[in-house]
Amino acid sequence: MPIAKVHARSVYVSRGNPTVEVDVVTETGLHRAIVPSGASTGQHEAVELRDGDKAKWGGKGVLKAVKNVNETIGPALIKENIDVKDQAKVDEFLNKLDGTANKGNLGANAILGVSLAIAKAAAAEKGVPLYVHISDLAGTKKPYVLPVPFQNVLNGGSHAGGRLAFQEFMIVPDTAESFSEGLRQGAEVYQKLKALAKKKYGQSAGNVGDEGGVAPDIQTAEEALDLITEAIEQAGYTGKISIAMDVASSEFYKTDAKKYDLDFKNPDSDPTKWLTYEQLADLYKSLAAKYPIVSIEDPFAEDDWEAWSYFYKTSDFQIVGDDLTVTNPLRIKKAIELKSCNALLLKVNQIGTLTESIQAAKDSYADNWGVMVSHRSGETEDVTIADIAVGLRSGQIKTGAPARSERLAKLNQILRIEEELGENAIYAGKNFRTSVNL
């Protein structure tokens, strides 16, 4: 079915920054995708093309990327007349048109918008939901697996104001019977946590961060974990809900000293208190011994390979590479060879096409890694990643707290998918790391 029209426009993400929205029109109607954007971006990611005009949006405009879709990509794609159902061919064409390894010419934000909108057009042409089409593209087996929602309920690091260095603390409802039950448990714990935060740290502690989590003025990881543990207990789920952390440690790595500064938000932090990677690894292990931690993301800086490999050898929980791997096939290959981590954080906008995202997941599965599909801190009402998580059988999705519409949009979409699939789906639960094999 030919493409009648490709049109991009500038819209906004949840942080008030511009992003690219793409419409693809075929005989089945209009198919739309919006590209997310991150705050802490890894240096090995595909290029998010920004205008750089400081007079508008502080330089963060995407009018160049929009123009690239409307004047270059769209006309070329229509002329090429590729079948929208052949996603690999479409994405290969987009990459060739760009001509760079990191999509720096046309912009990964321009290319991804088109790639995802095309996938939606293809699903419509086949008369199936998007997750079914993605499952077909990836060749995943049935039944469908619904992911465990990793819910970021407490924010620190670059996402929040207090001294807390670690960026995200997530609750993981991995003993629930179903996705909807897991989400309910998460929502109940979140409400308790909000009330606790206000009571202990004052009314403003109930204010939410970019991803919907609370951001009280917390100093240490222990303090954060104690608060979450108390909320889990108050909700009646002690022993039933696990915890995960995204440390985002590249944000507080001192490259020259090769040390980690847990007081990085303080301009006068004391260099004698900075930690070596061994000391930081010991801190993680002591936390995991005391709290039900099942997953740690970005425990070390993105190029501190030695630290990752050291930690991997001595840990049994899930170690997720985000800044380390940036959904990039070459980085994933290196991480597999160096035995650096055992799970991939999959962010479609880090690599820039659906085909490459699917391949990144398959490469990870092939080495028995887990795959966690992830939102970005700058999100929109687009729910594509919910379908990707189900279509890829990833078994785990990270899309913020059960708060703020741009986060809940994805979780609500999985509720709909769960209802639609009924008995034909299983909840990943405790098997979230190996759900592709369920």
From Swiss-Prot:
This is Enolase. It comes from Penicillium citrinum. PROSITE patterns: ENOLASE. It is an enzyme of class 4 (lyase). Mg(2+) binds at residues 246, 297, 322. Keywords: Allergen, Cytoplasm, Glycolysis, Lyase, Magnesium, Metal-binding. NCBIfam families: eno. Mg(2+) is required for catalysis and for stabilizing the dimer. One of its GO terms (cellular component) is phosphopyruvate hydratase complex. Homodimer. It catalyses: (2R)-2-phosphoglycerate = phosphoenolpyruvate + H2O. The gene is enoA. Its main location: cytoplasm. GO terms for molecular function: magnesium ion binding; phosphopyruvate hydratase activity. Its EC number is 4.2.1.11. Belongs to the enolase family. HAMAP family: Enolase (MF_00318).
